[in-house]
Amino acid sequence: MKLTYFANWKSCLRTLVLTMMVIVAVLAVKPAAVQAKASDYTQDTEGWIEACQKVGRDLTKYNFTYGSHNKPTLSASIKHGRKANCASYVSWCLQEFGVLKKGQTFYTRGGRIHKRFKSWRGKVQIIKVNKKLTSVNLQPGDIIGWRDIVHTNIYVGKNGKGQKLWLDGGSAGTRRGRVRRYYSADKIKTFSYLNKHKVSFIIRIKGL
């Protein structure tokens, strides 16, 4: 009888220890950041801008700096390097919204699109322009590729004064200094200097 009681007591103690070890292990694991899905956004201009602002907020939240050698996804960049530029920002926005698959990116050079994937899968319309910005009819949500500067950003609309508004994940979204640190890639701003530059092409998401 005593031996049976002792055996049961040892079994209970072993179970309790194992349970405590599991609890400690669970508590020690940091919760993963919640990743938004494309389905979390309304498939319209408002949802597209919201997705872009979410990416911009993450650049500030995770202390990104401006530069090259960035990763093909935002999550990979958060883990390694934390570098961004205008093209990676727009690419990550398109991934966030579901236009591009995770890991698909593009960049611009010489007024041309250089994509690191085979196809846009019919999700966008590429409009060749080659005109000064002031002569171009833009729609809110358009992605702009510039002819005479190596840059790409997102047109949001106009303010009450008729000034064009932008979301920009290039150096314009960073603080000046030896290290260009992001702080405003989620902020809608006017960039009047763009008025003198030429638009090479527009990437227009279908259905917006």
Protein language model features and the residues they cover:
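Aromatic- and glycine-rich peptidoglycan recognition patches
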Residues: S39-D44, V124-L133, D148-L208
